[in-house]
C-alpha cells in the first residue's frame, strides 16, 4: 500500500470515491476549458472523470510524483497524458504542450499533509500557471481542517485567490471530503 510506503505523497487511506471525483469535475465545468492540468492523479480516479468530460479540442496533461501511480493511471486511462514529474514543474509542461497558462488546474495533492514551505511553493506555482479568471479545484479531507497544515492551506487560498468556494461534503468518501473551487 502506497500510504505506508510514501505517506506524504499519497496522503489518503483509500482512492478518492467516484462521488467526490464526479463532484470536482462537475464543479470545474470542463466543457468550456481550453487547457486542463491535473496534479497528483494518484491511481487515476479523477483522470477517468476528466477524460470522460473534456472536449476533444482541450489540452490535458497530469503530473504525478509517484512512479507506481503514474503507471497505474496510464493503465487505467490510456488516452491520458501522464508525466512522472513534480507539481512544481507545471510551467515546464505547459511549455511542452505549447501553452502559456492553464484555465483549469485540478488537484488531488494532499495539501493537508504538506510542510508549509512545500505548500507555499506549490500554491505559488499553481497560481502563476493560471490565466486571469482561471480556476483551481482541489479536494480537501474533512479531518484535515482540524490540523495546522489544513487550516494554513485554507487561509493561503483565501488570501491568494479572488474567490474561494467550498462544495458540499461527500460523506461517503473515506475519509469524508469536499472541493475547494478557487478563481484567480
Explain the meaning of each model-derived region.
Residues 44-48:
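Glycine-rich SAM-binding Motif I of class I
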Residues 73-74:
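Conserved SAM-binding loop
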